[in-house]
């Protein structure tokens, strides 16, 4: 509570807590899912008590050879438990932002999925497991390439028939190109800024379902 008050006094209005779930033969276990959900809910309740907005981030990692259906199943279990705990802790869901993973196959899975399948399964998972009171959903990129992250977000928004406002909260999906330019020449501030601005623009369009591969090509031509 003391730290939250300090952050508020410094001007913070949003906070984030991340719980990580790795898919394997015996994990995540039901106990780890429950323990992480409890921690996320306790955090969210304390943050709202401190008059800030909690960003709740339960991330099912891409690491592994699992297929898209396994990701769907684990994400379903994770989201269900998270919202059970959030309700137990009397968190006002309207005052939260969910930062989830998309439903995608593991990075080592031999069976790849296209953007249509990813979007359909992701939106279906959200509809079935996220209460309608949650209006803000900001996806993490989770190891996807920049183009994949933009393309999949765009497709999700194109078929979004819910009240969810779906946007992005990317790390690598927003910064990778800029960091690459920085690695080439740290003094090239213009090139670094241009790379960052481009990805911000592309992801902004994806948040409206207005991104296209042609826009990517035009911008880099």
Predicted regions and their residues:
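Active-site capping/gating regions of soluble enzymes
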Residues: 66-221
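Helix-rich catalytic cores of soluble enzyme domains
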Residues: 1-86
């Amino acid at each position: 509570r003391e730290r939250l008050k300090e952050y508020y006094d410094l001007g913070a209005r949003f906070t984030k807590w991340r719980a990580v779930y790795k898919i394997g033969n015996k994990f995540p276990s039901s106990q780890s899912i429950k323990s992480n959900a409890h921690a996320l809910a306790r955090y969210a309740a304390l943050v709202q008590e401190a008059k800030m907005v909690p960003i709740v981030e339960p991330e099912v990692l891409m690491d592994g050879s699992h297929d898209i259906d396994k990701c769907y199943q684990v994400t379903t279990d994770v989201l269900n438990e998270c919202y059970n705990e959030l309700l137990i802790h009397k968190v006002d869901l309207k005052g939260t932002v969910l930062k989830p993973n998309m439903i995608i196959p593991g990075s080592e899975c031999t069976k790849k999925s296209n953007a249509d399948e990813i979007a359909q399964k992701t939106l279906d998972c959200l509809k079935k497991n996220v209460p309608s009171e949650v209006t803000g959903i900001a996806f993490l990129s989770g190891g996807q390439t920049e183009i994949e992250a933009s393309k999949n977000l765009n497709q999700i928004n194109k078929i979004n028939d819910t009240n969810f406002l779906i946007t992005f909260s990317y790390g690598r999906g927003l910064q990778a190109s800029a960091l690459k330019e920085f690695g080439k020449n740290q003094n090239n501030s213009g090139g670094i800024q241009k790379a960052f601005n481009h990805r911000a623009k592309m992801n902004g369009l994806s948040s409206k379902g207005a991104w296209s591969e042609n826009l990517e090509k035009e911008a880099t031509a």
